[in-house]
């Protein structure tokens, strides 16, 4: 009997496996994505918005501040999780509700202005319909992602990735302009300054619709990288694949 027990007692005790916490995944990639989004927004809208704030009308000023503020909000939210301040994160999350509603309302207004005459100078429909289509299709994704993030807020993994998707859904205009200025530098597009009926100088971005191709490639590539790392770390859930399919179909 003792001979049978001895080997069992000599076996080392195994400790239960501890779940490894990936600190880099503090908010579904929201922290680095928000930083990139802010930089791209500043670069894309600097020539026509941030450097001309004294010439921007009230409607564009309000939307621009709300959209830029949303990027900062997600950055702060991701940072609060990173420094372990969940209470502040929740408070700021609920305060984001009226901000988001205003963002959606002004986004709809911007789409209407884009597809209509502004300052007596109508935007060519052949150009506007391509560029405007991306906003029309991205807006429902923005709403779905935010509402889903609120409803599924107790599922931290899904919640964080849905908030990251709100960044990408609202980033298309900035990314398009960012690539557009690169195309201008390469001589593939041009900028025209014309005086409207109201006497104000308007900047016309000829060929802006062509920038939508690298824009969608950029967004799809960002999502593909996010999906790969989630899959590699055995934490892949539905938000990123859903967003990838959404953008791919619309593209």
Regions found by a protein language model. Give the residues of each.
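Alpha-helical membrane insertion/targeting regions
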Residues: 2-251
């Amino acid at each position: 009997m003792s001979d049978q027990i001895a080997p069992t007692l000599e076996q080392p005790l195994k400790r239960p496996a501890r779940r490894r916490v990936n600190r880099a995944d503090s908010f579904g990639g929201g922290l680095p994505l928000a930083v990139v989004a802010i930089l791209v927004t500043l670069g894309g809208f600097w020539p026509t918005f941030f450097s001309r704030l004294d010439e921007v009308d009230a409607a564009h000023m309000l939307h621009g501040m709300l959209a830029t503020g949303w990027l900062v909000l997600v950055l702060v939210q991701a940072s609060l999780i990173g420094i372990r301040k969940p209470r502040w994160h929740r408070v700021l999350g609920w305060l984001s509700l009226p901000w988001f509603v205003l963002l959606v309302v002004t986004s709809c207004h911007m789409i209407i202005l884009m597809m209509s005459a502004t300052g007596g100078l109508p935007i060519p429909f052949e150009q506007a319909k391509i560029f405007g289509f991306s906003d029309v299709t991205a807006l429902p994704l923005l709403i779905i992602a935010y509402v889903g993030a609120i409803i599924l807020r107790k599922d931290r993994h899904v919640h964080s990735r849905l908030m990251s998707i709100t960044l990408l859904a609202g980033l298309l205009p900035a990314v398009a302009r960012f690539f557009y200025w690169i195309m201008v530098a390469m001589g593939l597009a041009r900028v025209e300054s014309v005086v409207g009926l109201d006497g104000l100088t308007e900047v016309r971005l000829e060929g802006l619709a062509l920038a939508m191709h690298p824009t969608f490639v950029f967004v799809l590539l960002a999502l593909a990288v996010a999906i790969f790392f989630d899959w590699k770390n055995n934490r892949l859930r539905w938000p990123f694949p859903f967003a990838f399919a959404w953008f791919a179909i619309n593209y």
